[in-house]
Amino acid sequence: MPRTVIIDGDILVYKVSTGIVEEFEDEECIFQTVSWGNKEQAKQKVNDLIEKITKDTKSTDYIIALSDATNNFRKTINPNYKGNRKKIKPILWKFLREYLTTNHKTYEKPNLEADDVIGILATSEKIIKDDKVVWSMDKDFKTIPCKFRREFPNGTHESKIIYEDEADWWFMYQTLIGDRVDGYDGCKGIGDKTARKILGDVGEKSLKEMWIFLFLQMVMLFQSKQQKSV
């Protein structure tokens, strides 16, 4: 049966570009770290990794999801988004992105991250019509309904199916509590306990019902604050 593996291109590029770079520091002066990487080694390694991922996921084809390299709608809305990340990309980052887009099957959309693109590819019945599986090393894929294979740095992996009701619940949960690592604070005053109380158990409410319930909770909270201020 035909199967396409949707590869997290950001993770792919980062894994390869950081794995073969050498660094040198001159500590006798005001030092600057100098890095260099071998382009041929990088191409060979990324080709080998794509082949391995395709084989490991028992896929017959692959597509690589990439982030828009210049714009990100989240940073337009929230300038603090991922503000704690290093500003300088690994030295082979740009080269590998260009190599992938020129020599491999890639997919990207303006203003979107690879995660968003993966969500589109995994849930669309028109773009990829056959069986699909997502590959990444990122833990934050609970919000996408899909077959998912997560690789760990030590070489082990985890394979699971994320069902739609579970994905919807985690989407709402993360919307409420935020993600401090990425610089998104979520809804003020709502932590894990309150979020779980609002949402209930996985599958208890549909996505629409969770949105309505949340909206009503916010209205009640606003009215309560208004009454206290009178």
Language model regions located:
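Non-catalytic, usually N-terminal nucleic-acid engagement modules in DNA/RNA processing proteins
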Residues: 1-63, 67-68, 74-76
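Extended two-metal-dependent nuclease catalytic cores across DNA- and RNA-processing enzymes
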Residues: 2, 31-33, 59, 83-230
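Short acidic, glycine/serine/threonine-rich loops at helix termini
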Residues: 17-18, 75-79, 144-149
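Intrinsically disordered, low-complexity, Ser/Thr/Glu/Asp/Lys/Arg-enriched terminal regions and linkers
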Residues: 41-54, 70-82, 92, 98-99, ...
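Short, glycine/serine-rich, charged loops/turns that create anion-binding
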Residues: 69-70, 139
